[in-house]
Design a protein with these regions (language model features):
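Short alpha-helical segments in extracytoplasmic peptidoglycan/chitin-binding modules
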Residues: 290, 303-304
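Acidic-histidine catalytic/liganding microenvironments
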Residues: 6, 200, 293
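Conserved Radical SAM active-site core
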Residues: 1-176, 180-183, 215-222
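A glycine-rich phosphate-binding loop feature that marks nucleotide/adenosyl-phosphate handling sites
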Residues: 115-122, 211-216, 251-267
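Residue-level signature of tetratricopeptide-repeat
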Residues: 307-308
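Long, highly charged, low-complexity intrinsically disordered interaction regions
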Residues: 221-292
Length: 310
C-alpha cells in the first residue's frame, strides 16, 4: 500500500494456493480484495487468480472487485489434466470461465458497449482473423453463449461505502495460463487450444509458463530436463500473430509439422514456407498483406498505408 501511495506501483497480482478448501481460500481472496478497494482505497489495477471449485458467488464478487480475473487452464488437454492433476477436470475450469465470459458480456451490453472485448474488435476487419464475424460464426462462438450467465451477478458485488463507487465486472477481461513442457502436447495443440479459447471464451490474454522440473515423478520430465524458455517465447510470438496479425493456428502449424522452429520466429518461418506470396508491392499492397511481411507490424503497416499518395 505504501508503494501505491508513493506511486511506485500502479497495480498488483493477487493469487494463492489452496488453503483448507477452495471455498475458504476464495473467501479470503475476496476479503483481501475488499480491504484493498475500501479500507485502503487501492484504485489501481488488480489481476486476481481464482480458485477452481469455489462457489459462484465468491467468483462473481472477485470479478466486481478486480480489473482482470484468471481461471487458469494449466494444461491444454483433458488427458494431460487428468494425468498430472487428477483432482481437477476440464468441467471445473471451463464452466466458471464461461460464466465469467457471459457476465462480462452482459455488463458491457448494459452500459452500451459491444459484448466482446475491444481487443477483439481491433482485429475484426482482417480477412480470416480469428476474431472476424465470419470466423466466429463458423466456430459457433457467437451462438455458444447463454445458459451460463451468473444470474443477478451484480447482487454478489460487495456493498459500496461512502466514497467507493461500484466497479464494472472484470473490465480488463479474463485470462488463463498454460504450462509448457510438463506434458507432451505439441505446439500445434497448444496454439489450437489458444485459438479456441480466444474465440469461444473471448479471453483477453493467454499466458504461457515454461515448466521448471523440481520434483522426481515418473509422469513429469526428469530434473535435468532443460527449461523450454525459447519454446515459450515462440508460443508468445505465435499468440501475437493470432491476436493482431490475422493469422490462424492452421496457417502456422499442422499435424505434419506440429512444432515451431525454435531458431526462427513463427512469422519469418511462415514467410519462408510461402515464398510464392513474395515479393509484394508496398505502394499497393493491402494492410493485411503488409502485416504478413517479416519486420512489418501493425504500426508500420498503418503508417505505410497512411503515407501513400493517390
Amino acid at each position: 500500500i505504501e508503494f501505491y501511495k508513493r506511486n511506485y506501483i500502479e497495480g498488483l497480482f493477487l493469487s494463492s494456493g489452496v488453503i483448507r478448501d477452495p471455498a475458504y481460500t476464495m473467501e479470503q481472496i475476496c476479503i483481501t480484495l475488499q480491504l484493498l478497494r475500501t479500507k485502503y482505497r487501492f484504485n489501481g489495477y488488480i489481476h486476481v487468480k481464482t480458485i477452481p471449485g469455489a462457489p459462484d458467488e465468491l467468483l462473481a464478487a472477485a470479478g466486481f472487485l478486480a480489473d482482470r480475473i484468471s481461471v487458469n487452464l494449466e494444461l491444454p488437454t483433458a488427458e494431460s489434466l487428468k494425468k498430472l492433476a487428477p483432482n481437477k477436470s476440464f468441467q471445473t475450469i471451463m464452466t466458471p470461465m464461461g460464466k465469467v465470459r457471459d457476465t462480462i458480456a452482459e455488463t458491457r451490453t448494459l452500459i452500451g458497449k459491444d459484448a466482446r472485448m475491444e481487443r477483439s474488435l481491433g482485429n475484426r476487419y482482417l480477412p480470416g482473423s480469428i476474431f472476424g464475424k465470419e470466423q466466429l460464426r463458423l466456430t459457433g462462438a457467437q451462438s455458444n453463449r447463454g445458459g451460463s450467465l451468473w444470474k443477478k451477478a451484480a447482487s454478489f458485488a460487495p456493498a459500496t461505502q461512502d466514497t467507493w463507487k461500484p466497479r464494472a465486472f472484470a473490465p480488463a477481461g479474463q485470462s488463463t495460463q498454460m504450462i509448457i513442457g510438463a506434458s507432451d502436447e505439441s505446439d500445434y495443440t497448444l496454439v489450437q487450444t489458444t485459438q479456441k479459447l480466444y474465440q469461444n471464451y473471448d479471453l483477453k490474454r493467454v499466458f504461457y509458463s515454461a515448466y521448471i522440473p523440481v520434483n522426481e515423478d515418473s509422469a513429469l520430465p526428469a530434473l535435468e530436463t532443460p527449461v523450454p524458455l525459447l519454446r515459450e517465447h515462440r508460443l508468445y510470438q505465435a499468440d501475437w500473430l493470432l491476436r493482431f496479425y490475422g493469422f490462424q493456428a492452421d496457417e502456422l502449424l499442422s499435424e505434419e509439422r506440429p512444432n515451431f522452429n525454435v531458431r526462427m520466429d513463427p512469422k519469418c518461418d511462415w514467410a519462408i514456407r510461402h515464398l510464392e506470396q513474395f515479393p509484394i508491392e508496398v505502394q499497393t499492397a493491402s494492410y493485411d498483406t503488409l502485416l504478413r511481411v517479416p519486420g512489418i507490424g501493425p504500426k508500420s503497416a498503418g503508417r505505410i498505408v497512411k503515407a501513400r499518395r493517390y
